[in-house]
């Protein structure tokens, strides 16, 4: 089934005859080229012609070009301009910095800047902890990238990564009211990245690492967290892993299996795959089998990469060997964070009863849901046009909201497990089913539930520096 790219719409300004016949020809030309007319807005009316803005949805650049050429061939129609609504949304960037207090009088100015601000600065100099109370630090997160692993685009560099980082900052604000700012670094050197983050950290309450390629991302996260006393999280690893675990908790309940008894095959050697395996093990899943292009990672092989060595030593308890297809025999769960179309229907038929398949390669999953449907009980993807979308937007806003609120010094495994449990618990026993194992990213209950769970876990583990009153409806906190 073909699917239109979300948000890919063109606004085409046309001068044309004012007859219905002319518009009918236009509609036919657009439809024949593969476009869909969503809206028509009149801009001006002349004696013999009208100017209209026609909004057209297209599935690809090829369809967009075909629509344009079809219109240009029409007699009596002049294509004045074409605008892409996605590009229009990015004009001038997508985020701004706005003051919380208006500055309209000398009194206002003296409070927010000189001379009054000097007293605030001296108070922080005397007690640096006051920065959490008196500056943006209490609610700010740096979204840091080097542009080496951006979405499915790969190494496109820091400047091209900026629109993605701006979008991430928008989501922080929209979903969790966190003030996030994009930091796009023009270096791929691990040491330089770490030093830069450490030096800019004083004004931030948390660090979100984003779209940094593996295996460098593991080392960068570890080194930065060792040197800072604020939470640091590589979202591509841990946000994804948290949501996968949340979905698996509910999927296991749907098929009536205990998490501890599952055999889970994980395909994907990048950041998300490694973090997912660690989360599964931390939750009690005992049999996790990692697979890369060469087959199952096992203890019979020697690996130059320390992360592969870790996988060999801590997973695949029966030391299975063979291809993905071979190790899927008898498996309960397949989790793919790898490449498109690597699974076949016959692979799914080898799995245990009521297979669970999370195929999350984007935009094309390891197997399409309509192909897998006859052979699986629960199916999830990373796409929004099928049920059970695994999207880390369910995790990172609430995780950072909770960490900032309790002033956590680190994001622990316990806090991430608490986040996964909170996401899973949004869906009740009555609601849970094969096509509903993970809530929508727009479910307004998610962020608050995750934040409360994360803050409570931080307090329990002794990494919270602020005690929250987390009773239902409470929003109070007391410094510890």
Q: Residue ranges of each PLM-predicted region?
A:
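Glycine-rich phosphate/diphosphate-binding loop of Rossmann-like nucleotide-binding domains
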Residues: 151, 158-176, 228, 234, ...
């Amino acid at each position: 089934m073909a699917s239109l790219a979300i948000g890919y719409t063109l606004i085409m300004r046309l001068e044309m005859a004012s007859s219905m016949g002319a518009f009918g020809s236009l509609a036919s030309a657009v439809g024949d080229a593969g476009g869909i007319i969503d809206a028509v807005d009149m801009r001006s009316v002349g004696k013999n012609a009208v100017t209209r803005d026609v909004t057209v949805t297209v599935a690809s650049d090829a369809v967009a070009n075909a629509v344009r050429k079809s219109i240009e061939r029409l007699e009596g129609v002049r294509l004045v301009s074409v605008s892409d609504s996605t590009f229009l949304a990015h004009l001038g960037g997508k985020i701004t910095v706005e003051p919380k207090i208006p500055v309209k009088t000398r009194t206002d100015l003296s409070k927010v800047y000189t001379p009054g601000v000097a007293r605030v600065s001296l108070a922080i100099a005397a007690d640096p902890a006051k920065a959490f109370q008196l500056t943006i630090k209490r609610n700010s997160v740096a979204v840091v990238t080097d542009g080496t692993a951006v979405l499915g685009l790969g190494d496109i560099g820091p400047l091209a990564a900026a629109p993605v980082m701006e979008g991430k900052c928008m989501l922080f604000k929209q979903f969790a009211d966190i003030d996030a700012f994009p930091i796009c670094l023009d270096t791929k050197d691990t040491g330089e990245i770490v030093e830069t983050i450490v030096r800019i950290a004083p004004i931030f309450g948390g660090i979100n690492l984003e779209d940094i390629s593996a295996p460098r991302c593991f080392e960068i996260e570890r080194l930065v967290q060792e040197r800072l006393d604020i939470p640091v999280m590589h979202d591509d690893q841990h946000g994804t892993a948290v949501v996968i675990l949340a979905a698996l908790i509910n999927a296991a309940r749907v098929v009536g299996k205990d998490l501890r008894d599952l055999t889970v095959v994980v395909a994907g050697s990048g950041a998300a795959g490694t973090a997912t395996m660690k989360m599964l093990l931390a939750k009690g899943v005992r049999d996790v089998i990692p697979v890369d292009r060469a087959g199952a990672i096992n203890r019979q092989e020697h690996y130059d990469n320390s992360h592969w060595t870790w996988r060999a030593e801590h997973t695949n308890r029966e030391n299975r060997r063979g291809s993905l297809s071979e190790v899927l025999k008898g498996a309960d769960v397949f989790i793919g964070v790898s490449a498109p179309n690597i699974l076949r229907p016959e692979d799914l038929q080898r799995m245990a009863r009521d297979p669970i398949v999370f195929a999350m390669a984007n935009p094309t999953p390891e197997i399409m849901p309509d192909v897998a449907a006859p052979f699986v009980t629960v199916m999830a993807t990373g796409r929004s046009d099928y049920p059970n979308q695994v999207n880390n937007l369910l995790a990172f806003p609430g995780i950072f909201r909770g960490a900032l609120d309790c002033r956590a010094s680190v994001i622990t495994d316990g806090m991430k497990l608490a986040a996964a449990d909170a996401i899973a618990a949004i869906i009740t026993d009555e609601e849970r089913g094969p096509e509903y194992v993970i809530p929508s990213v727009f479910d307004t209950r998610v962020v608050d539930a995750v934040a409360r769970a994360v803050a409570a876990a931080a307090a329990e583990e002794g990494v919270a520096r602020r005690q929250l009153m987390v009773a239902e409806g409470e929003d109070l906190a007391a410094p510890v």
